[in-house]
Amino acid sequence: MTSAKPFPITKRQVWEAYKRVKVNRGAAGVDGQTLTEFDGNVVNNLYKLWNRLASGNYLPPAVRCVEIPKSDGRVRPLGIPTVSDRIVQMVVKQVLEPVLEPVFHEDSYGYRPGKSAHDAIEQARKRCWKFDWVLEVDIKGFFDNIDHPLLLKAVRHQTQERWVVMYIERWLKAPVQMPDGTIMTRTRGTPQGGVISPLLANLFLHYVFDMWMQRHHSNVPFERYADDVVCHCHSQSQAEALFRDLKQRFTQCGLELHPRKTRNGLL
C-alpha cells in the first residue's frame, strides 16, 4: 500500500509523470535505454520506479553530456538524463511547480506555463515607449554555475516536503558522463536538459534577481526569460548604476555577467 511508504508519493503521480515524459520524447541516457524499450515493460518499470521513489531509495544515475555546437564555434553542454530519471524529475516538478508558480514574478517568462518569449518581447516593446535606455543582461554559463547551497535554501523556503528537497539535492550531486566516457563530479550547476532544471533555475533567479530588483530597484521594470534580462531605465547614468549593482549582486551569488552580451544602450 502507498500509505506504508515513508514518503507520500502515489502510483498515480508516477503514471502521470510518465505520460508527460512520453509526449516530450527525448534521447537515451547513460544506460542506453530508449523510451520505446522502457515501454516494452512499462507496468513493471513504473512499479519498480515508484517503489524506490516512495521508499526514499531512488538514486539518480549519471547524466549523459552531449555537446551542442553554437554559432560562435563553441559548444553548449546538454545533460541527458535516463528515461527513468526523467520520469522521477517530472514527479517532483508536478509537485513543486504549482507551489512556485503563484510566487514567481509576473515578468519572469522563461519555461513557465502560459508564458512565452513572445509575451516578453511584447511587454518590452510597450515599455520601450516609456523608457529611453535599456540594460541587456546575460549571465555567463548560468546553468553550470548555480550555487547548490543557495538553491537548496530557496527550495526549503518554498516546500515542506522532505522528499522533494532530498531528491533535488541528489540530482544536484549526480555526476556527469562526458562524451569521452569519463565521469565528472559536480559541485555547482544543474544540467541543461533535465526536466527539473528550468524550474530550479527560475527559483534561483527569483531570489537572486527578481526579488532583489523589487527591493533595491523597484523603479526599474524588466522582462526576464531564464537568464536573459532586459531592464528599462530613464537615463544612461541609471543604467550604468544598475549595471554596477547587478555585477556586485551576481558576484555575491557565485555568478558572472557575460562581458560581451551585457550592455546598455539608447533606444
Go through each PLM region and give its residues.
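Non-catalytic, polymerase-adjacent accessory regions of viral genome-replication enzymes
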Residues: 1-43
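Conserved phosphate-binding loops in nucleotide/dinucleotide-binding enzymes
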Residues: 77-82
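Duplex nucleic acid-engaging cores and interfaces of nucleic-acid transaction enzymes
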Residues: 84, 88-91, 125, 152
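Electropositive, glycine- and tryptophan-enriched low-complexity nucleic-acid-binding patches
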Residues: 89-107
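Short, compositionally biased low-complexity segments
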Residues: 10-26, 62-65, 94-99, 129
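Short alpha-helical scaffolding segments that buttress acidic/His motifs in well-ordered protein cores
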Residues: 17-21, 91, 167-172
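Conserved polymerase palm-domain catalytic core
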Residues: 52-67, 71, 103-267
